[in-house]
Amino acid sequence: MSFGEARSAWRSNGLPGHSVSFRCLLDLDGDLADELDVESRRLARAAATALTFEADAGPVSLADWLDQVPDGPGVLVIDGVLALSSRVGDRIATELVGAGDLLQPLWGGAEHLLACEITWRALLPMRFALLDAAFVKRVRFWPQIGQALLRRAGRRAINLDVQRSIAAQPRLEVRLALLLWHLAGRWGKVEPGGVRLPIPLTHQLLGQLIAAERPSVSHALARLAAGGFVTGHGDEWHLRGSVEHSLPSMIDPVAGRADRIVATVGARSTRGAACEPHQLRW
């Protein structure tokens, strides 16, 4: 799809979003640009262009945009944090995606026997890039770009597996502490005495991330705050100390379980970062 065709589709079909423009993806995504050497980057700049659009914080409809890329990699998140929620029956599970994550079209098929509703909510102002089949054709001479996008899809899957493992913890305080430190590894900012997590996370949203009800989350957060582990509110959270100092007092010392979790999760938290997703093993 050319820029003219995409812009025409945006206008005629009423696609959501604003500030639609055609941009060089390598200028917007520094990590992607770093996949290429200087000369390759110079040659690829003119080809690695994509339609970009923005969305304000709040509910976002991405289904129509995803319909524009049935044969392409998908919609790439450039900036912001997006809550992607899946509803089956009366239960909702949520995943947070951010810069570098790739969203694919919602494929249906006979193997899907359960009705599942997908919704998106921008927690922060968002910018996206539309990577369609035309984009793939333009960058075919630089396979590093496609390989990097494939690795990112794998990274997102691993992050989701980590979140599922966190949700399996029996104690809700432990689930919340692990989740917040996990999110801090990606979006946290080091501050004196701990890490600041500048993402608007309501109690309801936290519950949807770790399979818990909102009232229980509120009580668990109050207990964490009373212990000096976590402070803050819906717009910003502060994680005090380091994860290896916080978890042992929250976990029953059964068969050294607390020590195993601390050894993996807290390896780098003293420097203000949570562990890498693949380091979580218990």
Q: Where are these predicted regions, by residue range?
A:
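Glycine- and acidic-residue-biased ligand/ion/polar-headgroup-sensing regions
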Residues: 71-89, 99-101
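Cyclic nucleotide-binding regulatory module and flanking cytosolic helices
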Residues: 2-66, 70-71, 101-102, 108-110
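Cyclic-nucleotide recognition modules
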Residues: 95-158
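Polybasic "coupling" helices that flank or enter modular domains
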Residues: 144-209
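Hydrophobic structural packing positions in well-ordered secondary structure
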Residues: 80-81, 176, 217
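Phosphate-/nucleic-acid-contacting segments
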Residues: 185-282
